[in-house]
Amino acid sequence: MHAAEKPEGTLSSGEYFIRQSWSQEQDFSRPYHVHVPANPDRRKLPVFLFLHGNGGNARASMPAFLRQHPVMAARYVMVFPQGYQNSWNISAERSQADDRLFIEAIVDTLAACDNVDPDQFTVMGVSNGAALVNQLAIETQLPNFRHYVTAVSPLNDLQHDGRNFKAKGDDNGYETIVTPRTGARILTISGSEDPLVPYYGGPSPVIPAKNGKLGFVAAEESIFLWAKAMGYRGAKLEKPSRIDGKLEFFSYLNGTVVHCKVVGEGHGAAGAIDQATLLRFLEHQP
């Protein structure tokens, strides 16, 4: 393992940095941690980025995630960016950075490496990290992202106002209507009993916004909005397409856009999604 400002040539495991300036910092080195498989079975590897939740830590979450996902760790370049002050800037968090730009800079950098497949980037986020994944899916113009995975944070009512997707903007005003890029695969995960992010929509009792508490789109409505954005023209699913124990899957566009309802779980619902379930989605298995 080593630390370097920027990887060049063949990517190896280590800590790297993106330099960024914003209202809180000037020319600040923002870290991200990379794990590259030791003996990969392909020359160019797909990339999986994991975005921690508010209060989380990339360095701490990395070993646990790798341990819980050994098959993925052997097949993917695994990347763990660090949020400024352990947060991602969505509405009223400690970070006021342009976090979309930070993640896009990581993607641009890694996509140029010899052993990376530039067309196979996945980004998964949990809670506050998932809100940033939503922002990326709404706003990014990068062609590299193939999969978006969000856990316990469906679209909030800033990102979709009931009629349109909205870009965050420099002051978190969410005023500009945008059309997300099509062609992505999307998996969303929510717990039916989440006390922080209401499964059936409405304001969070806890999560702050600039004015009051942050509101959320209902989880099943959120995936329907994503399905329509990706080209679906049918009716909203009122019943799950498939049930596997406490997991209820709502699948659109032949499994391209999927919501997983974790019955009885709260804000830790991501823990119910095992490696096999995640790989089934990433590798386009029915």
What is each model feature region?
Residues N89-R94, Q135, A209-K213, G264-H267:
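Second-shell loop/turn segments in exported
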Residues E93-D114:
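Alpha/beta-hydrolase active-site loop
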Residues V47, S61-M62, D99-I106, N128-L132, ...:
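Stable alpha-helical elements in mature extracytoplasmic
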Residues I186-I189, G215-V217, I223-P286:
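C-terminal catalytic histidine-bearing segment of alpha/beta-hydrolase fold enzymes
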Residues R146-H147, V152-K236, F250-L253:
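The feature captures the conserved acid-bearing segment of alpha/beta-hydrolase catalytic domains
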